Amino acid sequence: MISPLFQSRRVVTTLCLLASSAGYANASEQVELAPSTIKATAQSQDGEHLDSVTHAGSRLSLTALQTPASTSSLNGDEVRSRGDENVQQAVARSPGITAIGTPGDGGTALSARGFTGQGSVMQLYDGSRMYSAMGTVTMPVDTWAIDRIEVLRGPASVLYGEGATGAVINVIPKKPFEGDIENHLRLGYGSYDSQQTALDSGGSLTDQLSYRLNLNQLRSNGWIDDGDSQSTFFSGALRWQASEDLTFTLAHDGGNQRPMNYFGVPMINGRYHEGLRDKNYNIENDKQHYDDQWTRLTTDWQISDRLTSSNELYYLTSHRRWQNAENYNWDAATQQLSRSGYFSIKHNQEQVGDRQTFTFKHSLGGLDSQSVLGMDVNRIRFKLTNNSPYNDVNPAGDPIDIEHPAPGNFQSASPYSELFKSTTRQLSVFGENRTQLSDQLSVITGVRRDYVDIERNALRDDSRTEKDLIGNNWKIGLVYALTPESSVYAQYSTSTDGVGSLVSLNPTQQQFDLATARQSEVGFKQALWDQRLEWTLAAYHIVKKKLLTTDAGNPDLTQQVGQQSSDGLEASMKLQLPQDWALTANAAFVRARYDQFDQSVSGVAVSRDGNTPVDVPMRTANLWLDKQLGSAVQIGAGLRYVDSRYADIANTRELPAYTVADASLSWKALRNTTLGLQARNLFDRQYAASQYNEGEQWILGEPRSLYVTADLSF
């Protein structure tokens, strides 16, 4: 049996051997601020490397080699060339990340290092966060406007506040750049009458003004019956270079989407039947509509060679609407399928915030040092309207034909009305420092304190509740540069998670504090042969405490004494091979479990100690191989593997493991014209991408599909 610390002595010994083999050449890593002139250039089209700056892992603009944490980055062109339609598909190709989204969470939930959902795996857009409500995030919409996606694995509350125990995903959009105006038009068409029209335009308007504009419209008939979907995304930014050391950037991003409204196929006698793959059991007048608008004003000021200031003022809104029949249950006794769970829900959310940081270079005890000090403040207003307690007209469910389900219409015995509104006020102060202890050794530290006040007004009984929460988090990491292109690191960090989405905590949840987590991690990173080979290895141990659990002596009582932990290994590799071959591969292993957790079952407290949390695969792996054929043609193919996962806390229902193959082809037919072909699920594998209704429904992955694109530059 693997010990709680993953046989840490062996891990450390292995890392030390790797370190010694890399050599001990002096590798000075002096901390330098950006030059005094702030310039904007076109984004690099090359892949990300270990010497590239990663913003998700630190506010100090450190490279991956300098960061004492497991980080990775996906280039936007790389994402689009592989046919990844959304952030979740793209980021699931990075080490240890699994997409587990359902319509109830906006289709965006992720699993990382044994922790799942919006409350533990945070998603940022351009470094900013919209606080999730009812476990839902619906921005960004697609991958067209993405410059890159950065991933920081492990606790990150010291950087971004509560809700970041498993990982942080930072989606960075394309930015304005200086130079001649460049335009890029894409037309796409594929299986299920899928269509795309997209535009990317940017460049200089004057010596001081530059811009970036992205538009993308998608629509499809979908691969299930009545599975129509459509979305429109806009991303625009205007950058003003007021002086050599002062810039202002005004940006607005907006998405309007109506996703394929799909809650999966029911299990028949506990088994999946392949003939039901394209069935849709939802109602005729179903609704799933998201409208998100983000406006941001960023000010960057190079005050001196040693001091910079950055401020971001933002206004974010999200309006979401669902109206569906979500549950489909098979009765083994009567051999009948019933439809129930008629839910009508609306979210109205508004967030105003500001983040101010100062970065300065200084001396600390005679040692070169760099620090970031900052604060952020947010006010979030949220209103929930629904038909709770969700009583169906037919409590036993409506019988429907499993092969030819009649759509029917929405019906509920519970009226649709406003349930509550809340105002959440958040303030945090934070700091981060990197000090060069020697030519090879550096220490990175960070602290953060969050204050949160939640005021909830129930609109049906005119009651009011309020809760104040405080989160304290810190980290410390050591990085030893073995050579200029290799480093070994160790770090300890903490995080806090809410017992639910903070802005929508119910009165019962408001009685409890934040859950707390801590992580120990060691790792190794190395680039060889002029960056033709880059590889990383990380091992970690995470413990999360203060989970809500049923009192073993009184099943009607909830206590905050539960505990969950995970141990894991992650490895990644990028290899440039002879003859224009390129290989990218990664693999992850995690052993996640409940250490102390009781669940109430029919009024009885049942221990789930030792069970695996829901939606957590033990193993994941990804591989992608590219080949350049001459100067005009590139082909690529890849595999995605996800291990089996449990669908319920009792670990009685299981989703099987799957391996899916994808492929791509691009041909530069003319100087300014490129034709592309993407094939998803090449071998038409039928698999459960996620689950709903505690595993009674499988949300299937997309069948084999082909998509052709024409890209024109002018």
Give the location of each predicted region.
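Short acidic/polar hinge/loop motifs at secondary-structure boundaries
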Residues: 128-153
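N-terminal periplasmic accessory domains that precede
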Residues: 87-90, 108-111, 137-139, 151, ...
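Gram-negative outer-membrane beta-barrel transporters
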Residues: 440, 532, 541-543, 560-650, ...
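Transmembrane beta-barrel wall of Gram-negative outer-membrane proteins
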Residues: 182-184, 188-219, 224-262, 287-302
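Membrane-embedded beta-barrel scaffold of Gram-negative outer-membrane proteins
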Residues: 298-326, 481, 487-491, 514-598, ...
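Extracytoplasmic beta-strand/coil segments of soluble accessory domains associated
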Residues: 56-64, 68-71, 88-128
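Structural signature of Gram-negative outer-membrane beta-barrels, strongest in the C-terminal barrel
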Residues: 241-243, 349, 367-372, 376-380, ...
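C-terminal beta-signal and adjacent terminal beta-strands/loops
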Residues: 641-648, 666-714
